[in-house]
Design a protein with these regions (language model features):
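Bacterial N-terminal signal peptides that target proteins for export
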Residues: 1-12
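Bacterial N-terminal signal peptides
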Residues: 10-20
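N-terminal nucleophile
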Residues: 24-258
Protein backbone atom coordinates (compact mmCIF):
# COMPACT_ATOMS: atom_id res chain seq x y z
CA UNK A 1 0.00 0.00 0.00
CA UNK A 2 1.35 3.44 -0.92
CA UNK A 3 1.62 5.99 1.94
CA UNK A 4 -0.35 9.21 1.69
CA UNK A 5 0.91 11.17 -1.27
CA UNK A 6 0.29 14.57 0.32
CA UNK A 7 3.97 14.45 1.31
CA UNK A 8 5.10 13.34 -2.13
CA UNK A 9 7.69 15.15 -4.18
CA UNK A 10 6.01 16.78 -7.16
CA UNK A 11 7.53 17.86 -10.43
CA UNK A 12 5.76 19.73 -13.20
CA UNK A 13 6.78 20.19 -16.81
CA UNK A 14 4.61 21.68 -19.54
CA UNK A 15 5.07 18.99 -22.14
CA UNK A 16 6.02 19.69 -25.71
CA UNK A 17 6.15 16.63 -27.96
CA UNK A 18 7.46 17.49 -31.40
CA UNK A 19 8.23 15.33 -34.38
CA UNK A 20 8.80 17.84 -37.16
CA UNK A 21 10.48 21.25 -37.46
CA UNK A 22 8.11 24.08 -36.62
CA UNK A 23 5.75 21.65 -34.91
CA UNK A 24 3.46 23.23 -32.35
CA UNK A 25 3.64 22.45 -28.66
CA UNK A 26 1.64 19.56 -27.28
CA UNK A 27 0.78 18.47 -23.79
CA UNK A 28 1.14 15.23 -21.99
CA UNK A 29 0.22 13.82 -18.62
CA UNK A 30 2.53 11.22 -17.09
CA UNK A 31 3.13 9.86 -13.62
CA UNK A 32 6.06 8.07 -11.99
CA UNK A 33 5.40 6.32 -8.69
CA UNK A 34 8.19 4.96 -6.58
CA UNK A 35 8.24 2.80 -3.48
CA UNK A 36 10.84 0.50 -1.98
CA UNK A 37 9.75 -2.50 -4.02
CA UNK A 38 8.43 -1.14 -7.29
CA UNK A 39 8.26 1.72 -9.75
CA UNK A 40 5.22 2.52 -11.87
CA UNK A 41 5.35 4.60 -15.05
CA UNK A 42 2.12 5.81 -16.65
CA UNK A 43 1.36 8.14 -19.55
CA UNK A 44 -1.36 9.22 -21.93
CA UNK A 45 -0.92 8.76 -25.69
CA UNK A 46 -1.91 12.04 -27.35
CA UNK A 47 0.67 13.97 -29.38
CA UNK A 48 0.10 17.12 -31.43
CA UNK A 49 2.45 18.01 -34.27
CA UNK A 50 0.51 21.07 -35.45
CA UNK A 51 -2.91 22.63 -34.77
CA UNK A 52 -4.48 20.31 -37.35
CA UNK A 53 -2.27 17.26 -36.97
CA UNK A 54 -2.44 14.99 -33.96
CA UNK A 55 -1.69 11.34 -33.42
CA UNK A 56 -1.71 8.53 -30.90
CA UNK A 57 1.72 7.32 -29.79
CA UNK A 58 3.07 5.23 -26.95
CA UNK A 59 4.91 7.52 -24.51
CA UNK A 60 6.55 4.68 -22.60
CA UNK A 61 9.93 3.55 -23.92
CA UNK A 62 12.26 0.59 -23.52
CA UNK A 63 16.01 1.14 -23.98
CA UNK A 64 17.76 -2.13 -23.20
CA UNK A 65 16.73 -2.95 -19.64
CA UNK A 66 15.76 0.67 -18.92
CA UNK A 67 12.16 1.89 -19.07
CA UNK A 68 11.27 5.54 -19.46
CA UNK A 69 8.70 8.20 -20.15
CA UNK A 70 9.48 11.63 -21.57
CA UNK A 71 7.81 14.97 -21.03
CA UNK A 72 8.77 18.01 -23.04
CA UNK A 73 10.66 17.95 -26.31
CA UNK A 74 10.62 14.18 -26.80
CA UNK A 75 11.85 14.30 -30.39
CA UNK A 76 12.38 16.84 -33.16
CA UNK A 77 12.24 15.26 -36.58
CA UNK A 78 15.28 13.04 -37.09
CA UNK A 79 17.55 15.63 -35.47
CA UNK A 80 16.80 14.89 -31.83
CA UNK A 81 15.37 12.05 -29.77
CA UNK A 82 15.43 12.19 -26.00
CA UNK A 83 15.70 8.41 -25.86
CA UNK A 84 19.10 8.65 -27.56
CA UNK A 85 20.36 10.53 -24.50
CA UNK A 86 19.14 7.67 -22.32
CA UNK A 87 20.91 5.20 -24.59
CA UNK A 88 24.12 7.24 -24.26
CA UNK A 89 23.85 7.50 -20.50
CA UNK A 90 23.18 3.82 -19.88
CA UNK A 91 25.53 2.58 -22.59
CA UNK A 92 28.67 2.77 -20.46
CA UNK A 93 29.81 1.11 -17.26
CA UNK A 94 29.03 2.65 -13.89
CA UNK A 95 26.38 2.89 -11.22
CA UNK A 96 22.76 3.86 -11.77
CA UNK A 97 23.65 7.34 -10.53
CA UNK A 98 26.45 7.52 -13.10
CA UNK A 99 24.05 6.45 -15.85
CA UNK A 100 21.49 9.11 -14.92
CA UNK A 101 24.24 11.74 -14.79
CA UNK A 102 25.45 10.56 -18.20
CA UNK A 103 21.92 10.84 -19.54
CA UNK A 104 21.69 14.42 -18.29
CA UNK A 105 25.05 15.28 -19.87
CA UNK A 106 24.08 13.75 -23.20
CA UNK A 107 20.72 15.52 -23.13
CA UNK A 108 22.42 18.88 -22.65
CA UNK A 109 24.84 18.21 -25.53
CA UNK A 110 22.13 16.96 -27.89
CA UNK A 111 19.90 19.97 -27.24
CA UNK A 112 22.87 22.30 -27.72
CA UNK A 113 23.67 20.59 -31.03
CA UNK A 114 20.04 20.84 -32.18
CA UNK A 115 19.87 24.55 -31.37
CA UNK A 116 23.22 25.27 -33.00
CA UNK A 117 22.10 23.54 -36.19
CA UNK A 118 18.74 25.31 -36.24
CA UNK A 119 20.35 28.69 -35.58
CA UNK A 120 22.47 28.21 -38.70
CA UNK A 121 19.94 26.53 -40.99
CA UNK A 122 16.47 27.52 -39.80
CA UNK A 123 16.42 30.71 -37.70
CA UNK A 124 12.61 30.70 -37.48
CA UNK A 125 12.57 27.22 -35.94
CA UNK A 126 15.41 28.23 -33.63
CA UNK A 127 13.49 31.25 -32.36
CA UNK A 128 10.37 29.12 -31.95
CA UNK A 129 12.17 26.63 -29.71
CA UNK A 130 13.77 29.36 -27.62
CA UNK A 131 10.42 31.09 -27.19
CA UNK A 132 8.87 27.82 -26.10
CA UNK A 133 11.72 27.13 -23.68
CA UNK A 134 11.19 30.53 -22.05
CA UNK A 135 8.08 29.18 -20.36
CA UNK A 136 8.43 28.58 -16.59
CA UNK A 137 8.70 24.82 -16.98
CA UNK A 138 11.18 22.14 -17.86
CA UNK A 139 12.13 21.97 -21.54
CA UNK A 140 12.63 18.22 -21.34
CA UNK A 141 12.01 15.88 -18.42
CA UNK A 142 12.76 12.17 -18.32
CA UNK A 143 11.77 9.50 -15.85
CA UNK A 144 13.96 6.41 -16.16
CA UNK A 145 13.57 3.15 -14.24
CA UNK A 146 15.88 0.15 -14.00
CA UNK A 147 16.11 -2.88 -11.76
CA UNK A 148 19.61 -3.00 -10.23
CA UNK A 149 20.46 -6.09 -8.17
CA UNK A 150 16.73 -6.77 -7.71
CA UNK A 151 16.23 -3.18 -6.50
CA UNK A 152 14.02 -0.93 -8.68
CA UNK A 153 15.71 2.44 -9.19
CA UNK A 154 14.15 5.67 -10.46
CA UNK A 155 15.95 8.61 -11.99
CA UNK A 156 14.50 11.99 -12.96
CA UNK A 157 16.34 14.30 -15.37
CA UNK A 158 15.02 17.84 -15.77
CA UNK A 159 16.42 20.10 -18.48
CA UNK A 160 15.61 23.77 -18.07
CA UNK A 161 16.72 26.86 -19.94
CA UNK A 162 19.08 29.25 -18.17
CA UNK A 163 17.14 32.49 -17.72
CA UNK A 164 17.68 34.92 -20.57
CA UNK A 165 20.26 32.75 -22.33
CA UNK A 166 20.19 30.16 -25.12
CA UNK A 167 21.70 27.64 -22.70
CA UNK A 168 20.21 24.70 -20.84
CA UNK A 169 21.13 23.04 -17.58
CA UNK A 170 20.08 19.65 -16.26
CA UNK A 171 19.14 18.58 -12.75
CA UNK A 172 18.91 14.97 -11.61
CA UNK A 173 17.09 13.16 -8.82
CA UNK A 174 17.82 9.56 -7.82
CA UNK A 175 15.50 7.26 -5.88
CA UNK A 176 16.54 5.83 -3.53
CA UNK A 177 19.17 8.44 -2.79
CA UNK A 178 18.05 12.05 -2.89
CA UNK A 179 14.47 10.96 -2.37
CA UNK A 180 13.07 10.46 1.09
CA UNK A 181 12.40 7.15 2.78
CA UNK A 182 8.71 7.24 1.95
CA UNK A 183 7.14 6.66 -1.42
CA UNK A 184 7.13 9.46 -3.95
CA UNK A 185 4.93 10.50 -6.81
CA UNK A 186 6.31 12.56 -9.69
CA UNK A 187 4.04 14.36 -12.15
CA UNK A 188 5.22 15.11 -15.68
CA UNK A 189 3.10 17.39 -17.81
CA UNK A 190 -0.32 18.74 -16.90
CA UNK A 191 -1.29 18.25 -13.28
CA UNK A 192 -3.50 21.15 -12.19
CA UNK A 193 -6.53 18.87 -11.83
CA UNK A 194 -4.57 16.05 -10.23
CA UNK A 195 -2.84 18.15 -7.59
CA UNK A 196 -5.88 19.32 -5.62
CA UNK A 197 -7.47 15.88 -5.86
CA UNK A 198 -4.40 14.21 -4.38
CA UNK A 199 -3.04 16.83 -2.00
CA UNK A 200 -6.10 18.76 -0.86
CA UNK A 201 -8.57 15.95 -0.36
CA UNK A 202 -8.74 16.43 3.40
CA UNK A 203 -7.64 12.85 3.99
CA UNK A 204 -4.77 10.63 2.85
CA UNK A 205 -5.14 9.19 -0.61
CA UNK A 206 -3.34 6.26 -2.13
CA UNK A 207 -2.87 5.84 -5.86
CA UNK A 208 -1.33 2.39 -5.95
CA UNK A 209 -3.75 0.73 -8.36
CA UNK A 210 -3.87 1.06 -12.13
CA UNK A 211 -7.48 2.26 -11.82
CA UNK A 212 -6.42 5.09 -9.50
CA UNK A 213 -3.58 6.17 -11.79
CA UNK A 214 -5.87 5.99 -14.82
CA UNK A 215 -8.38 8.21 -13.01
CA UNK A 216 -5.74 10.86 -12.29
CA UNK A 217 -4.61 11.10 -15.90
CA UNK A 218 -8.21 11.21 -17.13
CA UNK A 219 -8.74 14.32 -15.00
CA UNK A 220 -6.16 16.09 -17.16
CA UNK A 221 -7.61 14.50 -20.29
CA UNK A 222 -10.97 16.08 -19.52
CA UNK A 223 -9.32 19.44 -18.90
CA UNK A 224 -7.06 19.33 -21.98
CA UNK A 225 -8.79 17.09 -24.56
CA UNK A 226 -6.80 18.49 -27.46
CA UNK A 227 -3.46 17.67 -25.87
CA UNK A 228 -4.01 14.77 -23.47
CA UNK A 229 -5.73 11.66 -24.76
CA UNK A 230 -6.26 7.93 -24.44
CA UNK A 231 -5.23 5.22 -24.30
CA UNK A 232 -3.44 5.37 -20.96
CA UNK A 233 -0.58 2.91 -20.60
CA UNK A 234 0.82 1.82 -17.23
CA UNK A 235 3.78 -0.44 -16.51
CA UNK A 236 5.30 -1.66 -13.28
CA UNK A 237 8.96 -2.49 -12.66
CA UNK A 238 10.04 -4.54 -9.66
CA UNK A 239 12.99 -6.76 -8.84
CA UNK A 240 11.65 -9.52 -11.06
CA UNK A 241 11.17 -7.40 -14.17
CA UNK A 242 8.55 -5.27 -15.91
CA UNK A 243 4.89 -6.03 -16.51
CA UNK A 244 1.87 -4.21 -17.83
CA UNK A 245 -0.72 -2.98 -15.37
CA UNK A 246 -2.64 -1.47 -18.29
CA UNK A 247 -1.99 -1.44 -22.02
CA UNK A 248 -4.33 0.40 -24.36
CA UNK A 249 -3.08 -1.53 -27.38
CA UNK A 250 -0.62 1.00 -28.80
CA UNK A 251 2.44 0.08 -26.72
CA UNK A 252 4.64 -2.83 -27.75
CA UNK A 253 7.69 -3.19 -25.52
CA UNK A 254 9.44 -6.58 -25.80
CA UNK A 255 10.69 -6.55 -22.21
CA UNK A 256 7.27 -5.95 -20.63
CA UNK A 257 5.05 -8.94 -19.94
CA UNK A 258 1.76 -9.46 -18.14
Amino acid sequence: MWPAVRNAIRYLALALTCAAPMAQSAGTSAIALRSRYRIVLAADSRVVYSPNHGATECKLFEIGDVFATVSGLAHYGSSFRATDAIRDGFGTSGSFRDHVAGTAYSLERRIDKLLTTLRQTNPAAYRSLLQRSAQPSDFVELAVAQSVNWQPMLGIVELRRVSGQPLFTARTTICPGKCGRNSEIFYLGYWERIQPYVADSGEPRTVASAASIDRLIRMEMNAHPAEVGSPINILELNGSGARWLQNGGNCSLPGVGW
